Amino acid sequence: QQGIAPNVTLGMAAALSANGENNTGSETRVADAIRWCVFNFEADIISLSLGGAQDQSASREGPAVSATRQAVDAGIFVVAAAGNDGGSSDDGFVSAPGNVNLVITVGAADREGNVWSQSSMGESLDSDGNVRVYPNQKPELTAPGVDILSTGMDNQWYTSSGTSDATVFVAGALALILEAHPELKPNGQSTTACIELVKRALVDSMNSDTQHDSKQGYGQLKASAWLGQIPDEISC
């Protein structure tokens, strides 16, 4: 079997604890894992199949969010799960640190493209109280995230559903874009300009009129079209 982006160098950071409660973890530990990706592993993309509840006074600007801001400010792409609290229990917020403006935040959809019932709704305001605008409304998109077949323990196969599953599809597609356009990768002197360019290309690849839905985002992942929206000559 071959994954979406077989040529990547994959780094794994233990951000959660296997404690019998769905691998929960502290924000501090998640923040430490993100900073390891930034400073030790020197990642181009950080894929976060995790998230915390949106406490207006804590999680939205807690350690994990601060570490994520540090990553994107350095030009590192961050892709994060929108969260799985959709339906009647939806609090109206994507999970942290997916609430950070320049993060690509991913909801889940089924094989027919229908938004998964548990995929979290996005909020209209950012953490500073400003109205979110193109291309940073949350979530930005949906990707396959229902009954996803993958490998498990002891040479077993298993299926799972959630925005965490959807996140890795987007991270893989983004890895292929950086492979085709290595000039987009962070280089130690990077700003957020390349992230902004790639996010605009993402939205334009799905939705030419940039209409946004609070659960589906700007549309469904179209990896080839996303790549096609990246200009041949890049200045960022």
Question: Where are the predicted features?
Answer:
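Solvent-exposed loop/turn segments at secondary-structure junctions
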Residues: 16-19, 51-55, 84-88, 109-113, ...
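Structural recognition of the beta-strand scaffold that forms the well-ordered cores
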Residues: 3, 9-14, 38, 44-49, ...
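Short beta-alpha junctions and helix-cap segments that line functional grooves
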Residues: 64, 90-94, 118
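Short acidic, glycine-rich surface-loop motifs adjacent to enzyme active sites
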Residues: 15, 34-58, 81-82, 181, ...
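Subtilisin-like serine protease catalytic core
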Residues: 1-26, 41-44, 73, 99-103, ...
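Secreted peptidase-domain scaffold signal
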Residues: 83, 223-236
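Extracellular S/T/G-rich loop segment that most often corresponds to the catalytic His/Ser-adjacent loop
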Residues: 95-179, 225
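Catalytic-core regions built around general acid/base machinery
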Residues: 60-78
